[in-house]
């Protein structure tokens, strides 16, 4: 790995934030087109653009950090601030969903039967699949911490093992969540309960998929000897993101599954 000890910002401007924003616009517009006009063309274009952006952005980060040595201290500091601000924006994103849920559940209107859950809604049992999902995510939080400590101690094999376990637990969580959606006795169209439940848990599920992808890239990089005990911010950012996903799920479980049922 090339290392430069001077304090200069070496990374050149990147086009990928712009293409990433455009792909997000295409995906959200495509989702609306799919819902209202049953056309998936724009959505597929958005997904393709997003995947190409992800691939090329990660490729450039690997080249700049590992092969060119451009991740000097100011660059690493900028990346840390960027990740912190990104996670902060995600906190506010989920705050909106919790606000919608509590606004509706703390003072249910007469149209909902003046109680929560609304009349006609059979909520999911919080002690069944949701509790298993909670256990799976908490276990993944332990394994990602194990991976981080192994990397700090230059224990390559244990780091790979722990990271693989985390990814598999993330995949298992996603499959459990999908099976829960298929078996749920209500849909996203069933009033405010259905919409807040599926939007909040669905967006969390999307974040689990994104986090699993992030960790998979880290696993590939670790297999290629890209990380050292002193230079591994890519993995650190993924670990921060994964812990954020864990914490959000705990709030979702307590609020929507346990208290809300």
Swiss-Prot record:
| UniProt keyword Translocase present | yes
**Record-level GO cellular component terms:** mitochondrial inner membrane; mitochondrion; respiratory chain complex IV
Q: Which UniProt keywords apply?
A: Membrane, Mitochondrion, Mitochondrion inner membrane, Translocase, Transmembrane, Transmembrane helix
Concerning SUPFAM superfamilies, the annotation shows: Cytochrome c oxidase subunit III-like
| Ranges of the Mitochondrial matrix topological domain | 1-15, 67-72, 153-155, 224-232
Q: How does it sit in the membrane?
A: Multi-pass membrane protein
| PROSITE patterns xref list | COX3
Q: Which Gene3D superfamilies match?
A: 1.10.287.70, Cytochrome c oxidase, subunit III, four-helix bundle (1.20.120.80)
Subcellular localization = Mitochondrion inner membrane
Q: Which reactions appear under catalytic activity for this entry?
A: 4 Fe(II)-[cytochrome c] + O2 + 8 H(+)(in) = 4 Fe(III)-[cytochrome c] + 2 H2O + 4 H(+)(out)
Q: What is its EC number?
A: 7.1.1.9
Superkingdom as given in the UniProt entry:
Eukaryota
Which intervals lie on the Mitochondrial intermembrane side per UniProt? Answer: 35-40, 106-128, 184-190, 257-261
Residues that span the membrane, as ranges: 16-34, 41-66, 73-105, 129-152, 156-183, 191-223, 233-256
Which GO terms fall under molecular function for this chain's record? cytochrome-c oxidase activity
An example GO biological process term is:
mitochondrial electron transport, cytochrome c to oxygen
Is the keyword ATP-binding in the record? no
Signal peptide extent: none
Q: Which family does it belong to?
A: Belongs to the cytochrome c oxidase subunit 3 family.
* Subunit-level organization: Component of the cytochrome c oxidase (complex IV, CIV), a multisubunit enzyme composed of 14 subunits. The complex is composed of a catalytic core of 3 subunits MT-CO1, MT-CO2 and MT-CO3, encoded in the mitochondrial DNA, and 11 supernumerary subunits COX4I, COX5A, COX5B, COX6A, COX6B, COX6C, COX7A, COX7B, COX7C, COX8 and NDUFA4, which are encoded in the nuclear genome.
What does this protein's UniProt record list under function? Component of the cytochrome c oxidase, the last enzyme in the mitochondrial electron transport chain which drives oxidative phosphorylation. The respiratory chain contains 3 multisubunit complexes succinate dehydrogenase (complex II, CII), ubiquinol-cytochrome c oxidoreductase (cytochrome b-c1 complex, complex III, CIII) and cytochrome c oxidase (complex IV, CIV), that cooperate to transfer electrons derived from NADH and succinate to molecular oxygen, creating an electrochemical gradient over the inner membrane that drives transmembrane transport and the ATP synthase.
Q: What name does UniProt use for this protein? A: Cytochrome c oxidase subunit 3
Which species does the entry assign this protein to? Gorilla gorilla gorilla
């Amino acid at each position: 790995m090339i290392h430069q000890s001077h304090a200069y910002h070496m990374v050149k401007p990147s086009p990928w934030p712009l293409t990433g924003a455009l792909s997000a616009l295409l995906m959200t517009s495509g989702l609306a087109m799919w819902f209202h006009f049953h056309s998936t063309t724009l959505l597929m274009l958005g997904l393709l653009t997003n995947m190409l952006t992800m691939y090329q952005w990660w490729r450039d980060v690997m080249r700049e950090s590992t092969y060119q040595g451009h991740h000097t201290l100011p660059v690493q500091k900028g990346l840390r601030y960027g990740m912190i601000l990104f996670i902060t924006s995600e906190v506010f994103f989920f705050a909106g969903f919790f606000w919608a849920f509590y606004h509706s559940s703390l003072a249910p209107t007469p149209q909902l039967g003046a109680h929560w859950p609304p009349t006609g809604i059979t909520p999911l049992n919080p002690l069944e699949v949701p509790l298993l999902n909670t256990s799976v995510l908490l276990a993944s939080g332990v394994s990602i911490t194990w991976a981080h400590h192994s990397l700090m101690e230059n224990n390559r094999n244990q780091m790979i093992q722990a990271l693989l376990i985390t990814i598999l637990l993330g995949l298992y969580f996603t499959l459990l969540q999908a099976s829960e959606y298929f078996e749920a006795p209500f849909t996203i169209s069933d009033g405010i309960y259905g919409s807040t439940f599926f939007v909040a848990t669905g967006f969390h599920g999307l974040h689990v998929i994104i986090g699993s992808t992030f960790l998979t890239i880290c696993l590939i990089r670790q297999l290629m000897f890209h990380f050292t005990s002193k230079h591994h911010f890519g993995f650190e950012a993924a670990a921060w993101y994964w812990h954020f996903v864990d914490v959000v799920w705990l709030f979702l479980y307590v609020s929507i599954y346990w208290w809300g049922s």
